[in-house]
């Protein structure tokens, strides 16, 4: 019996290719910028970003949502809130946030509130900081469930039953940034959105499309406006100490 010393040419080729692939992957990772973790600092003379998000042209003609369950309480139909446009074209329920800010004010002390009310979620759109939590409750005398999912993969985060009016529970949010889609399986028209960010510099537009972000450290930032149907658009803002930077972002209906 003869022993086999050394590797065959095929094995040697495999080892060389695998080593090259590993080196290439490490080089690619090293070339990507690494964002610093958010640092909480005292903001003594911060500025404010104040602005409005508008919808270009006329809002799409959305038809009322047909109610398929609990009509005795929810009614026969519910207005579709996807495009809610106020005076002057102001667009409601747009999440506006600063991009890649690495230090500033502390996270909100209180959990988010997500209420099942009148067979809809309220609020429909809101921001959150990674590491936070959400208080889920129901003001309706019908069975709801609150089912948040990763918006990209549809993976379930958890699924909470709310069996009666006044029921509430507080749950942690995922530990990484991203968009969360919330639905009620019992009432398929019920949707909400939570944008988890690594910092607390975000706001949701009101009925007139207006938003305000306070206590911003001086600097130049990219401001992002995100809407569930119209997509997102960015603006550049320069924040000076103790001053207010104005912004107007216009989205187009899709």
Predicted regions and their residues:
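Sec-dependent signal peptide hydrophobic core
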Residues: 15-22
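Extracytoplasmic copper-binding redox domains, predominantly the cupredoxin/blue-copper superfamily
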Residues: 35-254
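N-terminal secretory signal peptides that target proteins for export/translocation
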Residues: 1-15
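Short linear/disordered segments characteristic of secreted peptide precursors
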Residues: 8, 22-23
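Cleavable N-terminal signal peptides
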Residues: 23-24, 34-35
């Amino acid at each position: 019996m003869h022993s086999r010393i050394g590797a065959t040419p095929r094995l040697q080729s495999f080892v060389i290719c695998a080593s090259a692939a590993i080196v290439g992957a490490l080089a690619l990772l090293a070339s990507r910028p690494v964002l610093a973790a958010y640092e909480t600092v005292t903001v003594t003379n911060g500025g404010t970003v104040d602005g409005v998000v508008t919808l270009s042209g006329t809002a799409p003609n959305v038809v009322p949502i047909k109610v398929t369950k609990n009509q005795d309480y929810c009614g026969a139909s519910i207005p579709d809130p996807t495009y809610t446009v106020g005076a002057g074209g102001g667009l409601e329920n747009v999440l506006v946030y600063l991009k890649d800010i690495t230090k500033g004010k502390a996270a909100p002390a209180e959990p988010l509130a997500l209420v099942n009310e009148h067979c809809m979620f309220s609020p429909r759109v809101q921001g959150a900081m990674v590491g936070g939590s959400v208080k889920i409750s129901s003001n309706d005398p019908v069975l709801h469930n609150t089912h948040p999912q990763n918006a990209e993969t549809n993976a379930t985060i958890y699924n909470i039953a709310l069996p009666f009016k006044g029921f509430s529970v507080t749950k942690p949010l995922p530990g990484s940034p991203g968009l969360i889609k919330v639905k009620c399986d019992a009432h398929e028209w019920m949707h909400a959105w939570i944008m988890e960010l690594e910092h607390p510099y975000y706001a949701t537009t009101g009925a007139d499309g207006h938003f305000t972000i306070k206590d911003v450290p001086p600097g130049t930032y990219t401001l992002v406006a995100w809407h569930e149907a119209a997509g997102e658009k960015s603006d550049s803002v320069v924040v000076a100490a103790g001053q207010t930077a104005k912004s107007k972002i216009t989205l187009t209906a899709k």
